[in-house]
Swiss-Prot record:
Compositional bias segments (type: Basic residues): 1242-1251
Protein name (Swiss-Prot/TrEMBL): Inverted formin-2
Organism encoding this protein: Mus musculus (Mouse)
Domain FH1 intervals: 421-564
Modified residues (Phosphothreonine): 1203, 1223, 1230
Length: 1273
């Protein structure tokens, strides 16, 4: 007995002794709690509350769940989950709280009402995805599982999952929507978590029914380096991981085969093949120019960055839309086609011009409304004129945008625009102090005014002009009456009220100055009914000379006055004028004597002059004669608050010039470098020079000698040092070294010979092995016995594959063809021509498997550039010969010291040169051997080809071995399942004996979906595989699909109109994989309505205990249902009409039928076919002849329409599918439904699911609740 078994028995004995525990202290007792109490407990997050709520949710019925959802229970859970995920998992308690919270969300989604409620709101799935932003791997695993289940649950769930990933990408500032999945997959080493991530990828890819959508989603993952990660994951020995990997590879192979079939043999996943096909298609047409232009434009788009990604996605959408419009654009012009391409469903976005028009109109309306309330002073309306609108010449916005409001006066607008100068500078810089929407300014002398709204600005005082208009080319026109203060700098006293509309306004640049209203300032006419706007757009007359006394207009100033008619209060913005030149009068309180010393400053806040001169201000009264003048004592202030004066330094005697301690004739930089060079030897200068004289290279390497050659003394330095006659001790260290070096005869030649001898040894050590390796690689290719045999095998296979084409009947091929063996894909997943060749070689020519040994020398020589190493050796030999010539002409001491050393280096270099000559000869032989051009053959490229082929060869061998091991494991799993099936106890009829409760079991949606995912999407693949085989020989019905009567509509006493017995083997052979069984429990009578049913048991979730644990080991998909009728009950006890199964009954068993309303009807579950459709009448007749089956099956009516049962996950969840997407079924429990068959697309089956009112239910009372457990098959 193992330790683990002993511990389990001890725990079991202890539990039996203690007896059943009434409650778990870690869970709140909410067995009979109402939804309101659970909602209140949710507002106090704790592990106890969440655990109790989970149990209540699992044991709840449909009505309770609906009340819980309607009272925002799911909202509270998701908000709590997002809040918990946001604060991290610094403590274990936080991690446990997150886990219990996500378990409650999973319990909600396990019910049909919960998952439908979540799918009804886009925000719920988005909130769920935000829980991924946590470091708790367990929480992320559960969230990913829920997203995967949503993907395969329904098309709506798949779309919401993709939307949630897009939302998560935006919230977390990621570049791609699948980045969160791929980053977790690449960084995690937790195998169960990796399996979950792969299941999410498979669910996202297999979710859509459209083939191109699946291929596009798969391409997105492949673009994020998914294939590289899968290659690494295949090395992990995990059964669940291998299931997901096989599911991905099988689906990928099937989709690629289908795409290639509908694309005329073009591999749509290969960029090169798609482009080659497209170029061949348009190369002989004018469209090739457009294609080239498009490609040139795409070259400028960067794929990185947020903007680049959006541009590529937008271009993809445009191309997809162009494909849709291609068949309907014959009679359209280019403009119409572009407009249709760029059209967007829904309300179009307004253009910038429309936005400007709208803003102008809105401002006008607001200004009119505010004017009617705020204007209290009557305004002047000149006789013969109309109220004025906001002039486009004076508006800071666009002239074009303002033209909408002044359309009634086109002539005035045209004249106003022509008066503008062409180069119009932006006006925003000249009006920084104005409100965001300044009103038009009063324009004097307008000829064609329009009725305007008044400005919404604070009311300015009239007649207070601030500055003159900006200087136009002509001077401003004369003003018939003098404008009060129109040309002054300082504001004059304000005139008596009421304010006049045409006084002293300045237009913003660049419009020219405008004339004022004639005689509008002299009198005060009665107020007009509507208040006019002071500004108006005039038509400037020919400009006469300026009036006498008028100041020429200064340059444009940053501000101007804005007169208004409200309350006589003025807000003035004047230009800053410097009065220090004496051009203007200075008040007495500003007349101070300048200080003679530099004074300390008083940190005050200076008031602007225009503010300080207000007539009611304190500062304005200082200039009146009645104010007494106060004069401070400036002298005392100057003494106290001046900076102390610096005392001049007394001239001191100049110090005597010191004699320098050292004498140097070198510049500072060279002296520093030489000192650094000498310090590395850690010895005296005499020792260094003695080593140079003796030729000792023990402390000199090549780099040191190269540095010494650069630091040798120059000609002028040598002359200065030789002319120095004083003591050498006065020289610096560097100069002393040079003096010692000059005493050595022929010191430059000695240093050069030392460097050549050391350098030659290094060159020989580096170049000689490479040259020898290249020579060996050439010889190995020329002498290999396996390479010609392998190439002969490839030649025969290639002639077989290319038979009948221009590439067939070949006598040989380029050696680079070996790299293309992996480009020829087989029908089997992950098997190429090279894989198959190696399998054949392993069977018939096992010696060829050692070819990688023959290719090892070329692989090692790959990357060696023969030309570079040859040139380096030749240059070194040339330097050696030159040094030998110099030594032979030198003194005998140098000859004796270096002649032999140089001769030995020269001989070694010449030997190396002979190796290069041999390499050149082998190159010519290799070019002749491989049928290559000797002038074009590159040894480096040839060796690189051999290295790449050797790597492919070795990898293919390993992959073949791994694939065999995986196939062996899969076979062992099948045998294990078969043995378990054989060990299952059976009754006398050969049917498995059922155990467990006799109550109806409700399907847990999420658990059933995840069980199918863990099995590798078996139901989905079964449905698709069966649909592909059946669709090829089926004739689509011409009549529209119609709902048929349920199979139970026949008279129960008469049985069915089909044969009562069928050969079981024949039926199984007809559809070997078309039927999946949902194992039923032992039938028991249904309780009557008068009796109280047993309380509903807790719906256990596989989050805590896998639901497969509740099944007996004999429950397998191959079991046959027991005879009789199997009525099916929904979650709330609503039973559908029973359905009989005549095709799967053993011989001699007749079908019995009971009415659905009979309370004694047997309960159970029935045999299902995931996403099944029946054969057409014609095909049924043909198949009936070969298999002796009746033309009308149990799931069909007389018209041949399919009424066979579907998967529970397809039918029991009514909102899960639309009428278009119907081929994905991923559940275990099944419910019969009325269904039709439609023909759509490429003859692939489609189901039409009726609405709820087409299903026939037999409702039970709420008191009769079935005992529910999760049945996962």
């Amino acid at each position: 007995m193992s330790v683990k078994e002993g511990a389990q028995r001890k725990w079991a004995a202890l539990k039996e002794k203690l007896g059943p525990q009434d409650s778990d202290p870690t869970e709140a007792n909410l067995e009979s709690a109402e939804p309101e109490l659970c909602i209140r407990l949710l507002q106090m997050p704790s592990v106890v509350n969440y655990s109790g709520l989970r149990k209540r949710l699992e044991s709840s019925d449909g009505g309770w769940m609906v009340q819980f959802l309607e009272q925002s229970g799911l909202d509270l859970l998701l908000e709590a989950l997002a809040r918990l995920s946001g604060r991290g998992v610094a403590r274990i308690s936080d991690a446990l709280l997150q886990l219990t919270c996500i378990s409650c969300v999973r319990a909600v989604m396990n019910s049909q009402q919960g998952i439908e409620y979540i799918l009804s709101n886009q925000g719920y799935v988005r909130q769920l995805s935000q829980a991924l932003d946590t470091s708790n791997v367990m929480v992320k695993k559960q969230v990913f599982e829920l997203l995967a289940a949503l993907c395969i649950y329904s098309p709506e769930g798949h779309a919401l999952t993709l939307d949630a990933l897009d939302h998560y990408k935006m919230v977390c500032s990621q570049q791609y929507r699948f980045s969160v999945i791929m980053s977790e997959l690449s960084d995690s080493d937790n195998v169960p978590y990796v399996v979950t991530l792969l299941s999410v990828i498979n669910a996202i890819i297999l979710g859509p029914e459209d083939l191109r959508s699946r291929a596009q989603l798969r391409s997105e993952f492949i673009g994020l380096q998914l294939l590289d990660i899968l290659t690494r994951l295949r090395d992990l020995e995990d059964a669940d991981l291998l299931i997901q990997l096989e599911a991905f590879e099988e689906a990928k192979a099937e989709d690629e085969e289908e795409l290639q079939r509908i694309s005329d043999g073009i591999n749509m996943n290969s960029h090169q093949e798609v482009f080659a096909s497209l170029f061949h298609k348009v190369s002989c047409s004018p469209a090739s120019a457009q294609l080239l232009s498009v490609l040139q434009g795409l070259m400028h788009l960067e794929p990185a960055g947020r903007s680049g990604q959006l541009l590529w996605e937008a271009l993809e959408n445009l191309v997809n839309r162009a494909v849709l419009l291609a068949s309907d654009a014959q009679a359209c012009t280019l403009e119409e086609v572009v407009e249709r391409l760029l059209s967007i469903k829904g309300r179009p976005r307004p253009s910038p011009l429309d936005k400007a028009h709208k803003s102008v109109q809105t401002n006008s309306v607001q200004n009119q409304g505010s004017s009617s309330q705020n204007t209290t002073t009557p305004t002047t309306k000149v006789e013969g004129q109309q109220p004025v609108v906001a002039s486009p010449c004076q508006h800071v916005g666009s002239i074009q945008s303002s033209s909408v409001d002044i359309a009634p006066q086109p002539v005035a607008l045209e004249q106003c625009i022509t008066a503008l100068p062409l180069p119009t500078p932006p006006l925003s810089s000249s009006t920084p102090v104005l409100p965001p929407t300044p009103p038009p300014l009063p324009g004097p002398g307008a000829t064609s005014p329009l009725p305007p709204p008044p400005p919404p600005l604070p009311p300015p005082l009239p007649g207070s002009g601030t500055t003159s208009p900006p200087p136009p080319p002509p001077p401003p026109p004369p003003l018939p009456p003098p404008l009060p203060g129109s040309g002054t700098i300082s504001p004059p006293p304000p005139p008596p009220p009421p304010p006049l509309p045409g006084t002293g306004a300045v237009s913003p640049p660049p419009p020219p100055p405008l004339p004022s209203l004639p005689d509008s300032h002299k009198t005060q006419p009665p107020p007009p009914p509507p208040p006019p706007l002071p500004g108006m757009c005039p038509v400037p007359p020919p400009p006469p000379l300026p009036r006498a006394g008028q100041i020429p207009p200064p340059p444009p100033l940053p501000g101007f006055s804005v007169p208004s008619m409200m309350g006589g209060v003025e807000e003035i913005i004047v230009a800053q004028v410097d009065h220090s030149l004496g051009s203007a009068w200075v008040p007495s309180h500003r007349r101070v004597n300048p200080p003679t010393l530099r004074m300390k400053k008083l940190n005050w806040q200076k008031l602007p002059s225009n503010v300080a001169r207000e007539r009611n201000s304190m500062w304005a009264t200082l200039g009146s004669p009645c104010t007494a003048a106060v004069e401070p004592d400036f002298s005392s202030i100057e003494q106290l608050f001046s900076f102390p004066t610096a005392k001049p330094k007394e001239p001191s005697a100049a110090p005597a010039r010191k004699e320098p301690k050292e004498v140097t004739f070198l510049d500072s930089k060279k002296s520093l470098n030489l000192n650094i060079f000498l310090k590395q030897f850690k010895c005296s200068n005499e020792e260094v020079t003695s080593m140079i004289q003796a030729g000792d290279t023990s402390k000199f390497d090549v780099e040191v000698l190269k540095q010494l050659l650069k630091l040798l003394p120059e000609k002028h330095e040598i002359e200065n040092l030789r002319a120095f006659t004083e003591e050498r001790a006065k020289l610096s260290n560097a100069d002393q070294f040079y003096v010692l070096l000059l005493d050595i005869p022929c010191y430059p030649l000695r240093v050069e010979c030392m460097m050549l001898c050391e350098g030659t040894a290094i060159v020989l050590d580096m170049v000689r092995p490479k040259a020898q390796l290249v020579l060996t690689a050439c010889e190995s290719l020329l002498t290999s016995q396996r390479l010609p045999v392998f190439c002969q095998l490839i030649l025969k296979i290639g002639n077989f594959l290319n038979y009948g084409s221009h590439t067939g009947d070949a006598d040989g091929f380029k050696i680079s063809t070996l790299l293309k063996l992996t480009e020829t894909k087989s029908q089997q997943s992950r098997v190429t021509l090279l894989h198959h060749v190696l399998e054949e070689v392993e069977k018939s020519h096992p010696d060829l498997l050692q070819l990688s040994r023959d290719l090892e020398p070329p692989s090692q020589a790959a990357g060696i550039n023969v030309e570079i190493i040859h040139s380096e050796a030749s240059a070194n030999l040339k330097k050696l010969l030159e040094a030998e010539r110099k030594v032979s002409a030198s003194i005998p001491e140098v000859q004796k010291q270096y002649a032999e050393r140089l001769q030995a280096s020269i001989e070694a270099s010449q030997e190396l040169d002979k190796v290069f000559d041999a390499i050149e000869q082998k190159k010519l032989e290799l070019a002749d051997y491989l049928c290559e051009d000797p002038q074009q053959l590159s040894l480096e490229d040839t060796f690189s080809t051999m290295k790449t082929f050797r790597d492919l060869f070795t990898r293919a061998l390993k992959e073949n071995k791994d694939r065999k091991e995986q196939m062996a494991k899969a076979e062992r799993r099948k045998q294990q399942l078969a043995e378990e099936e054989a060990r299952r106890p059976r009754d006398e009829d050969g049917k498995p004996i059922r155990k467990g409760p006799g109550k109806q079991e409700e399907v847990c949606v999420i658990d059933a979906l995840l069980a199918d995912i863990r099995k590798g999407f078996q139901l989905r693949k079964t449905a698709r595989g069966r649909g592909d085989t059946e669709a090829s020989g089926r004739v689509a019905p011409t009549d529209p699909p119609k709902a048929t009567e349920p199979a139970t509509a026949s008279n129960p006493t008469q049985g069915t109109n089909h044969p009562a017995s069928e050969p079981l083997d024949t039926t199984a052979a007809d559809e070997p994989q078309g039927w999946d069984l949902v194992d039923a429990v032992t039938p028991s009578p249904q309780p009557s309505k008068e009796e109280d049913g047993p309380p509903a048991l807790e719906r256990r979730s596989s989050w805590y205990v896998d639901a497969i644990d509740f099944l007996d080991p004999e429950d397998t998909p191959d079991a046959q249902p027991s005879e009789g009728v199997w009525p099916v009950t929904l979650g709330d006890g609503q039973a559908l009409n029973p359905l009989e199964f005549s095709s799967n009954k053993p011989p001699g068993v007749k079908s019995s039928h009971q009415d659905a309303t009979d309370p004694e009807a047997l309960w159970g579950v029935h045999q299902t076919e995931a996403d099944s459709t029946s054969e057409g009448p014609e095909d049924e007749a043909q198949r009936g002849q070969s298999t002796h089956l009746p033309r009308t099956g149990p799931g069909e009516d007389e018209d041949g329409e399919d009424t066979a049962p579907e998967s529970a996950l397809d039918t029991s969840l009514d909102r899960s599918f639309s009428e278009d997407a119907v081929t994905d079924s991923s559940g275990s429990g099944t419910l019969p439904r009325v269904q039709g068959r439609v023909s759509k697309g490429t003859s692939k089956r489609r189901k039409k699911r009726p609405s709820r009112n087409q299903e026939e239910f037999v409702p039970d009372s709420d008191d009769i609740k079935a005992k529910r457990l999760c049945v996962i098959q």
